[in-house]
C-alpha cells in the first residue's frame, strides 16, 4: 500500500490573542447537508487550564477553507475533548467532558498563576458542578446551526458515539472521573443514547490488567453489525491500543487484544472507507513525534500497522487524529500539535490517499 500526503495546513487557531490561543483534541465529520464540521477544545491557555470551550468550524468546499471557530459548549468548567456525530435527518451531537474545580486547583498549584486562581475563585463551585460536571453533550436538530442545553452521560470518549441502525447512538467510553483520577471501578462501558438525551446501559469491556488504565476508546459499527472498539491503554512506559469486539449490539465484548507495541501510540479514531477498508489513526508520542495509522482489509481481524502520516512534531503534546473521507475518495485527517517551538497547540489538517502498490 502506497501513502501519498499532499496537503498539510493549520485550520483552527486564534490570531487575535497570544494568551487564549491553545486548541486541541479535535474531531471531524460530514454533515447531512454535505458540509464538513470540525470541533475541538479551544481558546485555552494550555493543555490543562480552566478556560477551555468547545468550538466548531465548518467547511463548504471539502476542507479548502474553514470558518472561524464558533463556541458550541462553554460551561464555567474546563470543556475539553470535542466529539461530533451526525444522526437522523438533521440531528448533530457534540460531546465534551470537564473536571472539578478541585482538579484545576490541584493541576495548577505549582504555577501559582494569579489569572487562573482569580478565575477559579470567581466560580460558584457547588452550583457549577451540580449543573455541568461530567461527560457533557449538546444536540442540534438543524444540521449544526443551533444547539440545545448541555446534558450529561456516565461515560466519555474523545470523538463521541456512533449511530445505530435503530436511530440511537452507541456511546462507548470510560466511566467519568470528576477529578480525572484513576478510580477503583474505572472501566470502559457501553450505553445507548437516545435522541431525547435519555440513555440505557448495555454492557462493559473488561480491563486489560491491573495497573493499566483503559480509556479514550473509539467505536465503529460495520454493515454486518460487528462492533469494533479501539482503546487507549497506558501506564508509565506503556502507551498503546487494544481492540475489543461485540457481536450482539454492545451487550458483551471480547477480551481486549493488543494491536501495537508497548509504546505504539494512542488514542485511535476508526473510519470505514468507501471500499470497505478500515483505517485507525492515532497519535505517536515518541520520537519522531507525529501521527500514524493502521489499516485492515478484513473487517478488523488483522491490521497493517505503523504507517506514518506526519512525523514533524515538536514534542509529545499532539495527536488525537480524526478522519473523514472526501467526495473524491481522498482522506482528510485533523489533529492537534504545535506549529512552532514557542507557540501553542493548534488544529492541523492533512489530506492524503492510499493506493495499491
Label every PLM stretch briefly.
Residues 1-357:
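Asp-box/BNR beta-propeller blade signature and adjacent active/binding-site loops
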Amino acid at each position: 500500500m502506497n501513502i501519498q500526503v499532499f496537503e498539510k495546513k493549520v485550520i483552527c487557531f486564534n490570531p487575535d490573542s497570544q494568551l487564549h490561543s491553545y486548541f486541541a483534541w479535535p474531531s471531524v465529520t460530514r454533515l447531512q447537508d454535505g458540509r464538513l464540521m470540525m470541533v475541538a477544545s479551544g481558546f485555552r491557555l494550555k493543555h490543562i487550564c480552566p478556560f477551555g470551550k468547545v468550538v466548531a468550524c465548518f467547511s463548504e468546499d471539502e476542507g479548502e477553507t474553514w470558518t472561524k471557530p464558533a463556541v458550541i459548549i462553554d460551561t464555567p468548567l474546563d470543556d475539553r475533548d470535542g466529539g461530533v456525530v451526525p444522526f437522523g435527518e438533521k440531528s448533530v451531537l457534540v460531546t465534551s467532558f470537564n473536571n472539578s474545580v478541585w482538579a484545576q486547583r490541584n493541576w495548577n498549584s505549582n504555577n501559582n498563576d494569579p489569572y487562573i486562581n482569580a478565575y477559579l475563585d470567581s466560580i460558584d463551585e457547588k452550583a457549577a458542578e451540580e449543573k455541568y460536571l461530567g461527560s457533557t453533550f449538546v444536540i442540534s436538530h438543524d444540521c449544526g446551526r443551533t444547539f440545545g442545553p448541555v446534558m450529561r452521560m456516565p461515560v466519555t470518549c474523545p470523538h463521541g458515539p456512533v449511530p445505530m441502525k435503530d436511530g440511537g447512538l452507541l456511546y462507548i467510553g470510560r466511566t467519568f472521573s470528576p477529578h480525572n483520577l484513576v478510580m477503583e471501578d474505572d472501566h470502559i462501558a457501553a450505553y445507548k443514547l437516545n435522541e431525547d438525551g435519555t440513555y440505557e446501559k448495555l454492557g462493559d469491556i473488561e480491563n486489560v490488567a491491573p495497573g493499566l488504565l483503559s480509556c479514550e476508546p473509539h467505536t465503529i459499527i460495520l454493515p454486518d453489525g460487528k462492533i469494533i472498539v479501539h482503546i487507549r491503554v497506558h501506564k508509565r512506559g506503556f502507551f498503546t491500543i487494544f481492540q475489543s469486539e461485540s457481536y450482539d449490539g454492545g451487550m458483551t465484548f471480547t477480551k481486549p487484544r493488543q494491536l501495537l507495541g508497548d509504546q505504539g501510540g494512542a488514542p485511535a479514531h476508526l473510519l470505514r472507507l468507501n471500499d470497505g477498508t478500515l483505517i485507525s489513526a492515532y497519535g505517536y508520542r515518541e520520537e519522531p513525534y507525529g501521527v500514524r495509522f493502521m489499516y485492515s482489509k478484513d473487517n478488523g481481524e488483522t491490521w497493517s500497522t505503523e504507517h506514518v502520516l506526519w512525523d514533524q512534531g515538536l514534542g509529545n503534546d499532539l495527536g488525537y487524529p480524526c478522519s473523514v473521507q472526501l467526495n473524491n475518495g481522498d482522506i482528510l485527517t485533523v489533529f492537534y500539535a504545535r506549529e512552532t517551538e514557542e507557540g501553542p497547540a493548534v488544529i492541523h489538517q492533512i489530506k492524503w490517499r492510499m493506493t495499491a502498490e
